[in-house]
Amino acid sequence: MEEATSISLIPPKNRRIGEIIPENTPIQMATVTDSTGYIHPKWFKFQNEERMIVKIDIERVMCQETVKYAGIFEKRIICSIIVNDIRCVAEFRYNIESQRWRIFQVISS
């Protein structure tokens, strides 16, 4: 991916953060994995509607589990993120077979 561009993510008054961050979209995720296999996400990048690369830091991991959807194993990770001083809860999914990350949904904003 390209170098991250620093842009304002403040949504217009009629849009929520969940509408600014694309849901169910592939992302680039930076993580650290400890000796027990627990994944610690640090930040993620995505391409916004203006085709700019946006980087968002992850504040903390709230929960993590392995789930099976229609025969596909995925890591489901719920994290707290901060976008323009607004704390949000986001759900990320990591497909174990394809080894790809996506932001599944922004749960609250």
Predicted regions span which residues?
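Cysteine-centric segments in proteins
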Residues: 1-109
